[in-house]
A protein has these predicted regions:
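AMP-dependent adenylate-forming
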Residues: 11-35, 157-158
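AMP-binding/adenylate-forming catalytic core of the ANL superfamily
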Residues: 92-102, 109-111, 282, 393, ...
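Conserved AMP-binding A3 loop
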Residues: 33-37, 183-185, 192-216
Length: 549
């Protein structure tokens, strides 16, 4: 194995030359297909269009869209000219959008109509009312002094905005020499992508990631699953998150394999795409795999083509991973990391025993150093002792954008990144994640780790998903609260849960509060927002007349 000094654009051009007619991007549900050479030509045309509206080296270009076909076109176009691609969570509401556009010093924002109950066009007009009266490309806003353009990704026309067809036409006026000049200045250690942390613990920060960070992390991720150019990866995770744009896209980019895209997660579209395209790998967060396995039409699709994949994004239940292996025929691997480590820090390998792949998160990525430290003393923990996971290597971010104080909080003087996650290293060098430092429940002086209780409750028949969080307690400081989603048609009482726990786990770990819910508070990338569970628990106690003691 090795690390490569190639940029995203160089990788794309490599495969466009080596395998020009091989399919690269496929949208099976709409039969839309791009070969490597076709996509590369469209990327060059888009890059020239962006140059025509003032995008150049160092310019920040935002993308606010689901996995639409031109999402990757715009990514590679920005990468080729040295611009920074800023990914925007599709679940963002007005204040979050405005915060990100201001904080990132965005120059050009690319949008679609919207998602779910959010009208992106109207929200953009609310943020930038000047669009309704200004000439396209001449936007001036006091609140957003860097913003010059809004691009609608599609054919529709909106006042004050370009659409992608117009961008491509404008590119006809840009000489190839100008594009080549900008391409020649791009270095693999330049920032290419800025992702805002998903907000599981607080307000987002802009993580600056380089070509070198993300292409090499994607490459090594694929190596762990023995990817080759013959593989077909079904990508149904959002591209605005590292899981989609790095672990999926950069894996395919560096291995020359086919990426079968799903625009927005729909378990039926995922199953149909795997069946039709004969996908060999599938990625997803736990909630996605749950939805696929429990879909009423699951048995109609042939999953035997699958051989591997990744379940990540949040703590992965062992029982769920067993079901995926048995019913979807794939050897599940896991990747642990965070946006700040681009994102993989540790990973299991396809040849690892089931216990390692499903109960642990493997060992260090090649060319990195991972250690477990005592969060209070900073000393490295012995094997088998829990501590904070820390990482140093090629995958470490450049820092948080315009936030040196926050950067200094997580990057120490030896350039180790402190994750805030708790883990244990075993004698074979494999790691197990036990929770987050901030998620730990302290009940009357006893440290309780939610992951342990969650894994236990998953074994209770009828439980589809479960999360555990601390609920404020006058007597103990915190009490254990369990939030349970039941399988369809299952009825359960609080007493059933407590009876299941009794004499099997310590009494102080048995949930004091048990809530049956339909969903968990989530980020747009599928991560559960633990910090909001506490507020939800207090709200449910109030609604149900439960006294907090």
């Amino acid at each position: 194995m090795q690390l490569f000094d190639r940029t995203l654009g160089q990788w794309l051009e490599h495969w466009a030359e080596e395998t020009p007619d091989k399919e690269y991007i496929v949208y099976s549900d709409r039969n839309l297909r791009f070969t490597w050479s076709q996509l590369n030509r469209r990327v060059d045309d888009m890059a020239k269009g962006l140059i025509a509206i003032g995008v150049e080296r160092g310019t920040h270009v935002g993308i606010w869209a689901a996995n639409v076909p031109d999402w990757l076109t715009l990514l590679y176009a920005c990468a080729k000219i040295g611009a920074v691609y800023v990914t925007v969570n599709t679940n963002y509401k007005q204040s979050e959008l405005e915060y990100l556009c201001q904080n990132s010093d965005m120059h050009t924002l690319c949008i679609v109509n919207g998602e779910k109950d959010s009208d992106f066009v109207q929200m953009t007009y609310t943020m930038l009312p000047e669009l309704k009266t200004c000439e396209r490309g001449h936007l001036k806003s006091e609140r957003f002094p860097y913003m010059r353009n809004v691009v609608y990704v599609g054919q529709e026309k909106h006042r004050g905005m370009y659409n992608t067809a117009e961008i491509l036409l404008l590119g006809d006026n840009v000489e190839d020499d100008r594009l080549n000049e900008l391409k020649s200045k791009v270095d693999c250690h330049d920032v290419v992508n800025m992702q805002y942390t998903s907000g599981t613990t607080g307000f987002p920060k802009g993580v600056m990631l380089t070509h070198y960070n993300i292409t090499n992390n994607g490459f090594l991720t694929g190596e762990h699953m023995k990817f080759t150019a013959d593989d077909k990866l079904c990508c149904c995770v959002p591209l605005f998150h590292c899981f989609g744009v790095v672990l999926a896209t950069m894996n395919c980019l560096t291995h020359g394999c086919t990426q079968v895209m799903v625009e927005r997660f729909d378990p039926l579209v995922v199953l149909a795409s795997i069946h039709k395209e004969r996908c060999t790998a599938l990625y997803g967060v736990p909630t996605m795999f749950i939805a696929e396995l429990h879909h009423p039409m699951f048995d109609l699709f042939d999953m035997s083509c699958l051989r591997t994949g990744i379940m990540a994004g949040s703590l992965c239940p062992v029982e769920l991973m067993k079901q995926v292996e048995e019913k979807m025929y794939m050897k599940v691997t896991s990747v642990y990391g965070l946006t700040e480590t681009a994102p993989g820090m540790t990973a299991s390998r396809i040849d690892d025993p089931f216990d390692v792949r499903c109960n642990k998160v493997g060992h260090d990525f090649e060319f990195t150093e991972v250690k477990v430290i005592d969060p209070e003393t900073g000393e490295e923990c012995p094997v088998g002792v829990q501590g904070e996971m820390c990482n140093r290597g090629y995958n470490t971010m450049k820092g948080y954008y315009k936030n040196p104080e926050a950067t200094a909080e997580v990057l120490d003087e030896n350039n180790f990144l402190h994750s805030g996650d708790l883990g244990i290293k075993d004698e074979d060098g494999n790691y197990r994640i036990t929770g987050r430092i901030k998620d730990m429940i302290i009940r009357g002086g006893e440290n309780i780790y939610p992951r342990e209780i969650e894994e236990f409750l998953y074994k209770l028949d009828g439980v589809k998903d479960v999360q555990v969080a601390g609920i404020p307690s006058k007597k103990y400081g915190e009490a254990v609260g369990a939030f349970i989603i039941l399988q369809e048609g299952v009825q359960m009482q609080e007493a059933d849960v407590r009876d299941f726990c009794r004499n099997k786990i310590s009494r102080y770990k048995i949930p004091k509060y048990i809530f049956f819910v339909n969903e968990f508070p989530m980020t747009g990338s599928g991560k559960i927002q633990k910090f909001r569970l506490k507020d939800l628990g207090l709200q449910l106690c109030k609604e149900q007349g439960i006294e907090i003691i």
